[in-house]
């Protein structure tokens, strides 16, 4: 019986080429891979990873496999899955992958449960869906879990709420708190990729537009920097007074979203939270304006 669920196995060769291309830009992970081949630190450990199924994640999975881990990968977001990468991991590395680009909600949670069926010792989450499903619906599998990791702000918020309630049954490392994560991935990676997504989706000229950034955490800082670099007039909205002051000192206009709503041409929120843009904000916007939510939850 095939222990995977992907779109098309014939896409594997193209996926392998793209995975190797991404590896060129990942020298630290490559050096860890080489060390893991010799040390095998995860021998006998089962890992269930719920992450974006991309070329970068593929290199992480093969590195964990090289370290002896028995890994299963499922998608943390159906919209980001790269089907050729999923096929390559299955066909060339024999890593079970359950991920199809554009999968519906039922399939998404079927795949989440496939990750739990693996009886993981360690969970790797991006959005905390495996951990939350374990605690809500599959508690009989908690006994095998010794710990986990959570990559993104949205997931960390969920898990900290569980921990505060005494509901979190095992320790989870908040990867997002690592300086190498938020200083670089959040600020530079998310800043660039968000701008790339906005331009691809809208084909807008950014120069001269009033660009409203909701929040001033590390992701928002990166986007504000990129938008200004492309000639936008950037407004920042931020409820934390210290971060708001920092945005002012960085040279941005700072105001409430109520004040910014009628001024903006493009709105992008990067807070990992709800109600940054609400009905009354949309009602105050220009007749033609563009909104973009940059957060884990897209379903």
Task: Label each residue range with its predicted role.
Residues 70-79, 235-237:
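Short internal beta-strands
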Residues 54, 192, 199-261:
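Glycine-rich phosphate/diphosphate-binding loop of Rossmann-like nucleotide-binding domains
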Residues 54-67:
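Histidine-anchored nucleotide/phosphate-binding helix
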Residues 50-57, 77-81, 128-130, 218-219:
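Gly/Ser/Thr-rich loops at beta-strand to alpha-helix junctions
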């Amino acid at each position: 019986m095939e222990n995977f669920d992907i779109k098309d196995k014939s896409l594997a060769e193209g996926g392998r080429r793209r995975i190797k291309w991404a590896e060129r830009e990942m020298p630290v992970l490559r050096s860890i891979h080489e060390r893991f081949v010799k040390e095998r630190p995860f021998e006998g450990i089962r890992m269930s990873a719920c992450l974006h199924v991309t070329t970068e994640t593929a290199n992480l999975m093969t590195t964990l496999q090289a370290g002896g881990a028995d890994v299963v990968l499922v998608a943390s977001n159906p919209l980001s899955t790269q089907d050729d990468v999923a096929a390559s991991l299955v066909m060339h590395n024999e890593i079970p992958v359950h991920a199809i680009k554009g999968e519906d909600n039922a399939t998404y949670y079927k795949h989440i449960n496939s990750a739990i069926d693996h009886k993981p010792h360690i969970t790797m989450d991006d959005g905390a869906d495996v951990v939350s499903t374990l605690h809500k619906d599959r508690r009989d599998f908690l006994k095998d879990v010794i710990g986990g990791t959570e990559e993104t702000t949205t997931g960390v918020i969920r898990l900290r709420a569980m921990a505060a309630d005494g509901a979190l049954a095992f320790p989870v490392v908040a990867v997002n708190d690592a300086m190498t994560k938020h200083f670089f991935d959040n600020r530079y990676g998310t800043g660039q990729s968000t701008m790339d997504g906005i331009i691809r989706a809208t084909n807008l000229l950014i120069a001269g537009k009033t660009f409203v950034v909701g929040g001033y955490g590390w992701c928002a800082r990166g986007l504000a920097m990129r938008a200004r670099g492309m000639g936008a007039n950037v407004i920042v909205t931020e409820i934390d007074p210290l971060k708001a002051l920092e945005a002012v000192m960085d040279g941005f206009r700072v105001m409430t979203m109520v004040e910014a709503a009628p001024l903006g041409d493009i709105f992008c929120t990067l807070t990992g939270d709800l109600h940054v843009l609400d009905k009354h904000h949309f009602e105050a916007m220009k007749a033609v304006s563009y909104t973009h939510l940059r957060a884990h939850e897209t379903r």
